[in-house]
């Protein structure tokens, strides 16, 4: 009997310490601790029963004393557990409180100088990069300026070449016109006359003659006038066509000039037949019969009739045949 009691006294503290250790580790499972405690008690009772059976001791021996011992151990364990929980709550609550902020150190004069020097170094590096980029841009601008200058020089050379070609073309056309005028027209001394069967105003006719290296015909004397009359009559017979000459009084009424600006000293104006000559006057029946010039300021350009070679004043905007004169 005493041996059973002694064995129980020796085993119960170890079992309680085992249970306490299990409960200590069970802090992590606070949500399921109630069920675990009951299981622990059943496990202790089962272990004690198995030990008694293994030693051949009666099962009921020492139950009352063991129960008292277990009650005392339970009270001690619960007190220890309660104290551990309070300590854990204090430990858990303490970190949750707001930590006391550490005072930040105030910057010293050395820190300020270091900061300023650092900023100055950064600005200097940025300025250096800007200088590099500016140098690259300056180089690029110089290259572009040189390229633009070369392009301008090339364009100027091209314009000069085009102008030279135009001048050559004009001279070629003028030379061709002079040759054509002398080959196809009438050659008279140092002049050649060529009839054009295109209808043009007096100004347009002068422009076309000039483009071919000549001007509208300017007969300077009776010999040239008679030769030109024969040429026109032969070219346009049997019809009578007025043909523009290079004579006008646009500058001043009654002051007739050639296209080259020289004053006209020889005239071949149309005159109506007089009754004394035995011919029947035609002033009443033919609009071209009155003496010329008779248009005043409305008719300032001179045309030559192809049938008799007489001069008539006409409106400069009329479109007539024209005869060009070329130097030979």
Swiss-Prot record:
Annotated C-type lectin domain residues: 188-325
Keywords: Cytoplasm, Disulfide bond, Glycoprotein, Growth factor, Lectin, Osteogenesis, Secreted, Signal
Pfam families xrefs: Lectin_C
Superkingdom as given in the UniProt entry: Eukaryota
InterPro entries on file: C-type_lectin-like, C-type_lectin-like/link_sf, C-type_lectin_CS, CLec_Tetranectin-domain, CTDL_fold
One GO term describing the cellular component: extracellular region
Region (Disordered): 58-111
Cysteines paired by S-S bonds: 209-324, 301-316
Coiled coil: none
Gene3D superfamilies: Mannose-Binding Protein A, subunit A (3.10.100.10)
Swiss-Prot/TrEMBL GO biological process terms: ossification; positive regulation of cell population proliferation
Molecular function, one GO term: growth factor activity
Compartments where found: Cytoplasm; Secreted
Keyword set includes Cytoplasm: yes
Signal peptide: 1-21
Post-translational modification comment from the UniProt entry: O-glycosylated. Probably sulfated on the O-glycans.
Predominant cellular place of this UniProt entry's protein: cytoplasm
UniProt cross-references to PANTHER family, sorted A to Z: C-TYPE LECTIN DOMAIN FAMILY 11 MEMBER A, TETRANECTIN-RELATED
Function: Promotes osteogenesis by stimulating the differentiation of mesenchymal progenitors into mature osteoblasts. Important for repair and maintenance of adult bone.
UniProt protein name: C-type lectin domain family 11 member A
The gene coding this protein: Clec11a
């Amino acid at each position: 009997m005493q041996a059973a009691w002694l064995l129980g006294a020796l085993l119960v503290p170890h079992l309680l310490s085992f249970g306490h250790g299990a409960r200590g580790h069970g802090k992590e499972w606070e949500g399921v601790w109630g069920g675990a405690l009951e299981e622990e008690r059943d496990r202790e009772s089962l272990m004690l029963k198995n030990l008694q059976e293994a030693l051949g001791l009666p099962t009921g021996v020492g139950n009352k004393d063991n129960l008292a011992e277990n009650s005392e151990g339970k009270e001690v364990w619960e007190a220890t557990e309660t104290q551990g929980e309070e300590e854990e709550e204090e430990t858990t609550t303490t970190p949750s409180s707001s930590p006391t902020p550490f005072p930040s150190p105030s910057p010293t004069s050395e820190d300020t100088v270091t900061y300023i020097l650092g900023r100055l170094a950064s600005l200097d590096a940025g300025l250096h990069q800007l200088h590099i980029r500016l140098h690259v841009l300056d180089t690029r601008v110089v290259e572009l300026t040189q390229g633009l200058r070369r392009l301008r020089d090339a364009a100027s050379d091209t314009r000069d070449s085009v102008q030279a070609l135009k001048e050559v073309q004009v001279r070629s056309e003028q030379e061709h016109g002079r040759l054509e005028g002398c080959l196809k027209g009438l050659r008279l001394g140092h002049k050649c006359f060529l009839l054009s069967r295109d209808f043009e105003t007096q100004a347009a006719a002068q422009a076309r003659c000039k483009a071919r290296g000549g001007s509208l015909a300017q007969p300077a004397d009776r010999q040239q006038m008679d030769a030109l009359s024969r040429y026109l009559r032969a070219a346009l017979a049997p019809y009578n066509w007025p043909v523009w000459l290079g004579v006008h009084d646009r500058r001043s009424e009654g002051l007739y000039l050639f296209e080259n600006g020289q004053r006209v000293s020889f005239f071949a104006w149309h005159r109506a037949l007089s009754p004394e000559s035995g011919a029947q006057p035609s002033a009443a029946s033919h609009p071209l019969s009155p003496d010329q010039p008779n248009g005043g300021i409305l008719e300032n350009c001179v045309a030559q009739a192809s049938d008799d070679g007489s001069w008539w004043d006409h409106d400069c905007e009329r479109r007539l045949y024209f005869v060009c004169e070329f130097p030979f």
